[in-house]
Design a protein with these regions (language model features):
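Helix-start/capping segments and mature chain N-termini
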Residues: 1-77, 94, 104-283
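Ordered, amphipathic secondary-structure segments that act as subunit-interaction surfaces
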Residues: 75, 80-93
Length: 283
């Protein structure tokens, strides 16, 4: 089985799974999600992704009838059921099912729906540089929550596709926030600089791994706002996410960027890919 689906205890092919029309995720995007990647049927950084998922459940007043340990065991069991060990593992919880009304359903504090989807996807190749465009950040101020309400990110990602590039980096009130579905950081003068984790960006697991790698490798790091002009002038621009461990950017808005500190970037990238391969190797 390749494309595996799960919904409230039911398991089958994604294409054959059924979700009730009254699921509040369909009406309002009233829910949260997370995603990770597996290799050799081992999910990378699973504990970190689950911790973020439960933090977001709490922020949205959602109660999932499952402990973090139980969710982890479920995800690992589902990954072991698929043919290919390299999988994109996606899961979401919504505020239950009820006829459409904005307020919570009467049982909305204890009847969350859980959906899981698995399909064969590899992480981005380390030798594949990225091209970006930029656009104003039109999202609202819940960007630190991995909510299902992703319309602005969908539109930005589509703009990137139509421009023939990989991602769209967004900016708000003069400062860089993040890309449509990944974090963006930079190297300047040997220092790793990444936006702070406030309401404007998602606290990415990949971003956290970059900061940890910097500390291990002795690379100075700063968490602070920076502008698009600073980004264009960076020695290296770095994109990161669950599926993009550490990728260099070579073009921004049609102009060449980066390529000025390959040594420091290479250390970071090698460290992160070594960690990926080590923690997902066959036992």
């Amino acid at each position: 089985m390749k494309n595996l689906g799960y919904y409230n205890g039911e398991i089958g092919l994604i294409e054959e799974m059924k979700v009730p029309m009254t699921d509040r995720g369909l009406y309002f995007g009233d829910g949260i999600y997370d995603a990770a990647y597996s290799r050799n049927h081992v999910i990378y950084a699973l504990d970190e992704h689950i911790a973020r998922f439960y933090r977001n459940l709490s922020l949205l007043d959602l109660n999932l009838d499952m402990t973090p340990q139980q969710l982890g065991e479920l995800l690992c069991d589902l990954v072991r059921r698929v043919d290919d060990g390299e999988q994109f593992v996606y899961w979401q919880a919504t505020r239950g099912s009820a006829l459409r009304q904005h307020v919570y359903p009467e049982d909305g504090h204890g009847r969350a729906n859980l959906m899981v989807m698995l399909r064969p996807v590899k992480i981005r190749d380390k030798d594949a540089p990225m091209k970006l465009i930029s656009a104003p950040d039109m999202r609202y101020l819940y960007c630190d929550i991995k909510t299902l309400s992703l319309l602005p990110s969908v539109l930005s990602a589509q703009k990137a596709k139509e421009a023939g590039v990989d991602e769209c980096v967004m900016h708000r009130d003069g400062r860089v926030t993040e890309c449509s579905h990944s974090n963006v950081s930079m190297l300047k003068g040997g220092v790793f600089i990444t936006p702070p984790t406030d309401c404007y960006i998602l606290p990415g697991v990949g971003r956290a791994h970059l900061l940890s790698a910097c500390r291990t490798l002795g690379i100075p790091c700063e968490e602070r706002p920076f502008t698009m002009d600073e980004l264009r002038d960076a020695d290296e621009i770095i994109v990161s996410s669950a599926g993009i461990l550490c990728s260099a950017v070579t073009e921004l808005d049609g102009l060449p960027v980066g390529g000025k500190d390959a040594a420091t970037f290479g250390k970071l990238q090698d460290y992160l890919f070594d960690d990926w391969f080590e923690k997902t190797r066959c036992e």
